[in-house]
């Protein structure tokens, strides 16, 4: 598969400050959606700005379609990169209606062709009924669709999106994220998407790069990022979970406070004579009232179809557990649980 963008050994630092990004290696295939995911201040937006051409890099290179567009000596202007940009705050012109906002970037083409392009984009983002409205008359989701249509208007071959759903109400966010993914796939446009929200990333991305302190911690598909984190930062940042100590009973058997582990799933030589612990996610604990293994409910969060229970086992070990919401247990109640770990995620302490 052709590489649309290749980033090699990229570093970026602002004057008199430590490196914002260091030794970034990343690539994205044509038509792929890549998400840059990490906590606030980790460097993900700086990387997006460097790709767009807004920031000069100190070392390394960015190659697009086989041509270098950034290194420490040259920086192809933003306007020459053929990239569309969707900003966090939408950046719509308040004095222009939807039609005019979308048409803003369509310079030097006949009016008839421009109108046809705007009409096509309005239909694409399902906003034909809003074409004469002004930004203040639109919902957050509608404004985001206008911003997306405007970014797509000049027919870029790559789209950059910076926290595009951060200002969207939660009740419509899931549908909007799904709609945007469907649209990007329909257009087969290569997209790089920045967010701090793992659920957005998992819902929209083909590939995810986890960034922390200016470096890439892990990259891969969402499934592997969740089930096979390469370090404790990724394990902690992605999803919910707790760590429990592992005791090496003998050369082949391993035990945690909840019971014995399947020694066939453990690389014995890698962990011999080491102080190790295992990640236990809520889906590794099954609620079973008939189980002899009991834990006390310390907190609970109602999530509609289910509860997230925060438990304490043996007065010492915190656990998390999902249960259908018709199992409405009280704080302080002792409930039955079972251990059902499908993926062993083990790290040294």
Q: Where are these predicted regions, by residue range?
A:
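Non-catalytic connector elements of ABC transporters
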Residues: 241, 252-349
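Conserved coupling/switch loops of ABC nucleotide-binding domains, chiefly the family-specific signature
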Residues: 58-61, 213
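The feature captures the beta-strand-to-loop junction immediately N-terminal to the Walker
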Residues: 37-39
